[in-house]
From Swiss-Prot:
UniProt tissue specificity: Developing endosperm.
GO molecular function: nutrient reservoir activity
Pfam families on file: Gliadin
Disulfide bonds: none
Assigned keywords, A-Z: Seed storage protein, Signal, Storage protein
Keyword Signal: yes
Function, in words: Sulfur-rich seed storage protein.
Similarity field: Belongs to the gliadin/glutenin family.
Organism: Hordeum vulgare (Barley)
Entry protein name: B1-hordein
Compositional bias segments (type: Pro residues): 25-81
Length: 293
């Protein structure tokens, strides 16, 4: 019974205690933040002004093309005949028989006469020899003496006279000296050099009248202007004076033939004796065409 009362008192006390207790204050629920403020309205769209079209510029007119001029009719090229039907070039006569070139457009007067054959040959020969330097002629002096003594480039026989032995001994020395000097001369000058020493030997053996008559240097042989008959007989030039050389002072046809024969022998003998190459032609530089031996 007491126990029941104790429990009843405890229940009453607990009930009163609970009644007196204040309830927990309700904490207000925090309001969620307001959404972002609404953005202002976009700018009012202003209407674009009506675009005015660009003024069309007139296209400049292109210039009229040049009037086409008709080409003149072309002349056809003249057809040349085949080479086997063409006329051959006129063959030139030998060096010693060439005639002077005269103009064909105007006839020459009767007073103008062509050069004599001997004078023409002699003048052309001097024009050729003048290209040989004097030192070359001095260098070939043993060859000149060898030709002057009419030496023969053959071995000396065993049984000969004493005078002939001396001559052959001298010729042998000259032959050696000549063959030492001839190869030292440039090949393009060997022909003119041999011809020059033969010509000097020939002049020494001729009469004094011929020697005096051929002392002229360069002479004008060909007309300077085409179409004018200016081929006149050149005058020999002497130092300090000018005089006429007689016709008899120049080479005669038989002398020309003799000189050419002697030159031909020398041009065959010296190269073979010394085993050197000598051109068998000569070039007259600046005077007419090339002339062969």
């Amino acid at each position: 019974m007491k126990t029941f009362l104790i429990f009843a008192l405890l229940a009453i006390a607990a009930t009163s205690t609970i009644a007196q207790q204040q309830p927990f204050p309700q904490q207000p629920i925090p309001q969620q933040p307001q959404p972002y403020p609404q953005q202002p309205q976009p700018y009012p769209q202003q209407p674009f002004p009506p675009q005015q079209p660009f003024p069309q510029q007139p296209v400049p007119q292109q210039p009229q093309p040049y009037p086409q001029q008709p080409f003149p009719p072309q002349q056809p090229f003249p057809q040349q005949p085949p080479f086997w039907q063409q006329k051959p070039f006129p063959q030139q006569p030998p060096f010693g028989l060439q005639q002077p070139i005269l103009s064909q457009q105007q006839p020459c007067t009767p007073q103008q006469t062509p050069l004599p054959q001997g004078q023409l040959y002699q003048t052309l020969l001097q024009l050729q020899i003048q290209y040989v330097h004097p030192s070359i002629l001095q260098q070939l002096n043993p060859c000149k003496v060898f030709l002057q003594q009419q030496c023969s480039p053959v071995p000396v026989p065993q049984r000969i006279a004493r005078s002939q032995m001396l001559q052959q001994s001298s010729c042998h020395v000259l032959q050696q000296q000549c063959c030492q000097q001839l190869p030292q001369i440039p090949e393009q000058f060997r022909h003119e050099a041999i011809r020059a020493i033969v010509y000097s030997i020939f002049l020494q053996e001729q009469p004094q009248q011929l020697v005096e008559g051929v002392s002229q240097p360069q002479q004008q042989l060909w007309p300077q202007q085409v179409g004018q008959c200016s081929f006149q007989q050149p005058q020999p030039q002497q130092v300090g004076q000018q005089q006429q050389v007689p016709q008899s002072a120049f080479l005669q046809p038989h002398q020309i033939a003799q000189l050419e024969a002697t030159t031909s022998i020398a041009l065959r003998t010296l190269p073979m004796m010394c085993s050197v190459n000598v051109p068998l032609y000569r070039i007259l530089r600046g005077v007419g065409p090339s002339v062969g031996v």
